[in-house]
A protein has these predicted regions:
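Conserved C-terminal helix/tail region of periplasmic/extracytoplasmic solute-binding proteins
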Residues: 296-333
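N-terminal secretory signal peptides that target proteins for export/translocation
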Residues: 1-5
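Ligand-binding clefts/hinges and TM-proximal coupling segments of bilobed small-molecule sensing domains
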Residues: 141-160, 237-267, 309-312, 323
Length: 333
């Protein structure tokens, strides 16, 4: 090997090392953020799965890690500043009404994806009287959704008209349905589709009864104030992730298969078809109002006749709209 060739190879090797070092240094300097997600896959959270798996957070200069826990635990972690961004609008709004310093920053699902799915012998909602329904724990989104719909529209109360067994994760509720440990369960679209394939029946969609923000991210007020740029980057990544769902069917199906542990491509495609138009970064004022009103019912202990406070105080709408405008979008009203 000639001296010139050796020199060229040595220079090339040096450049590779230097370039690799620069990349490692840049990655190490990325702000680290923790992003909450619920146990088991959730149809409401598909854009956040995409933002992590497809590198959208990294593209915005954020080093993101998922933290999986129960919904209530995630809200408390956001309040304690242990997790920066948490997609729990139901529990978050309840905490805000009690004075928690939390705010909504960016949306995910703009429609309810909850169903009450039953064993095939249940023909109508009234057939659930005297039966056992699998729910989340009281105060969590799926519990509230089921109790409000059954109470408000069918005059059925937990403990009086039907029994309740609580489960931390949706896959456990699917298994209980299949094993006939329960006759009904609150399931999001993806898990309901899985149960339906096993012979179960989607009895009702709660979105037909109450509007729903789902997966809307909350953060501590101090984080938004002290790390405005980080919050803005997070919003940008989520805007792109919401767009990705509509624009990239195959990539989204891959993510669905991973997070819902689905090997059946046809089932994953069916889930995609259910949710492909469900997402958007906006937090529409009418849906926000419906969210808070659904948390101020007698079933949840809200005093009768007590009015809602000004709920716009619970949204950093200026930052969200500013980010959307910078991305060439007109914020929806």
């Amino acid at each position: 090997m000639t001296a010139i060739r050796k020199g060229v190879l040595s220079f090339a090797a040096l450049m590779i090392v230097l370039f690799g070092t620069q990349i490692s240094t840049a990655f190490a300097q990325m702000p680290k953020i923790k992003v909450g997600r619920t146990l088991g896959g959730s149809g409401f959270h598909i854009p956040s799965y995409i933002a992590v798996d497809k590198g959208l957070f990294k593209a915005e200069g954020l080093d993101a890690d998922f933290i999986a826990a129960q919904a209530g635990v995630l809200v408390r972690a956001a309040l304690a500043k242990e997790i920066e961004f948490v997609p729990i609008p139901g529990g978050g709004s309840e905490a805000m009404l009690k004075g928690a310093p939390l705010v909504f920053i960016v949306g995910e699902s703009l429609v309810s994806q909850w169903t009450i799915t039953t064993t095939p012998d249940i023909k109508r909602v009234e057939d659930l009287r005297g039966k056992t329904i699998g729910l989340e724990r009281p105060g969590q989104a799926a519990y509230t959704e089921a109790v409000v719909v059954l109470g408000k529209f069918f005059k059925m109360e937990p403990g009086k008209d039907y029994k309740v067994i609580t489960f931390n994760a949706e896959p456990d509720r699917v298994a209980a349905l299949i094993n006939k440990s329960v006759q009904g369960a609150i399931l999001s679209f993806p898990h309901a589709a899985r149960a339906e394939k096993e012979g179960m029946k989607i009895l009702l969609k709660t979105g037909d009864y109450i509007p729903r923000l789902g997966g809307t991210f909350i953060a501590h007020k101090d984080l938004v104030k002290e790390k405005r740029d980080v919050t803005k980057r997070f919003i940008r990544a989520m805007v792109k992730a919401n767009d990705y769902v509509k624009a990239n069917k195959k990539g989204t199906i891959d993510v669905i298969q991973k997070y819902f542990e689905i090997k059946d491509a046809a089932l994953a495609e069916g889930i995609y078809n259910q949710v492909q138009n469900a997402f958007g970064p906006e937090i529409p004022p009418d849906l926000l109002k419906e969210l808070f009103e659904s948390r101020t019912t007698p079933e949840l202990g809200w005093p009768a006749g007590k009015p809602l406070p000004d709920i716009e105080q619970f949204v950093v709408r200026d930052l969200l709209n500013e980010t959307l405008k910078e991305m060439g979008r007109t914020p929806k009203k």
